[in-house]
Structures are given as structure tokens and as C-alpha cells.
Regions:
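Basic, Lys/Arg-enriched alpha-helical interface segments
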Residues: 1-61, 68-84
Length: 84
């Protein structure tokens, strides 16, 4: 399993999510613990890059941006966005 490491700012961003997106957000974290490379690359020009993103929630209006540190088996949450 990968360890999820939230950035201090992501706690505030998660608190701002709509209630109906929280379960989907929790499911993203569960997937990231086992398969973080399944997310899309943040930069399409660098498809194997360690900075990834995962859309979630109703209408895929949420996005988690994260960094995979393979050697440490860590996933660092960089940003949680809601565009709804």
C-alpha cells in the first residue's frame, strides 16, 4: 500500500467540498492507496510523470492533484479542487 500524505492546504480544500462529493473523494483516496499510477498525468506531454490527477464527484467536477513518490511508497496530495 501507498501512504497518503496530505499537504496542509488540502484539509481546507476538502472541507470546502460539497457533501455529495465526499464519498467519491474518499473512494479516490482508497484507490490511490493501491494504484496511484492509474490516475491521468497532470502534464499530457509527460505521460510517465509523477504528478497525476484524478477526477471525481458528480459530473467529475472534482479533481485531486497528487505526487507519487515510488521509492517511499507515498502519495502526496497537492490540491483538491471543486469546479461545480
Amino acid at each position: 500500500l501507498y501512504r497518503i500524505v496530505p499537504d496542509p492546504e488540502t484539509a481546507e480544500q476538502v472541507a470546502a467540498l460539497p457533501v455529495d462529493a465526499l464519498l467519491d473523494y474518499a473512494q479516490v483516496l482508497t484507490v490511490l492507496e493501491v494504484s496511484p499510477w492509474a490516475g491521468s498525468p497532470q502534464n499530457d506531454a509527460n505521460p510517465h510523470g509523477a504528478v497525476r490527477r484524478w477526477a471525481f464527484g458528480p459530473g467529475m467536477a472534482g479533481q485531486v492533484v497528487y505526487l507519487v513518490l515510488e521509492a517511499q511508497r507515498e502519495v502526496h496530495l497537492l490540491m483538491v479542487q471543486w469546479i461545480g
